[in-house]
Amino acid sequence: MQPTGPCNVNPDALPPARGYSHATVAGDTVWIGGQIGSDETGKVLEPGDIVAQYARAIRNVAIALRAAGFTPEDTVKLTYYVTDMRAYRGSRGGLGAAYREFFRSDYPASTLVEVRSLVDPDALIEIDAVAVHRP
């Protein structure tokens, strides 16, 4: 396979990208920029509900993956940024159910990081991802 240069992907189903790209593809790899629980206009849905925001954020990751020609099954790494670790831990059942909508087996590596705040003050969680086409 011939190497290809980076290609940015910004699907219409995600908020307009200003100063960043939702996904960057280079060769067999895609990097998904941080996705929050927002609709296609950028409005955060369900302020205060980490499970609902997680479900939307992971859906947004899947939208970016598919727009770039990948699937959730191609994901090799997820990074979660949360503003309240206690809320995250207390919601693991609901978070797990939303997670399994996209990742049913072969769970990717992941990292969970607590941060002071995210780009939108109503955002409770942000997810970025890396995916590689599997042979």
Model-derived segments and spans:
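N-terminal presequence-like segments and the immediate start of the first folded domain
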Residues: 1-59, 63-76, 82-135
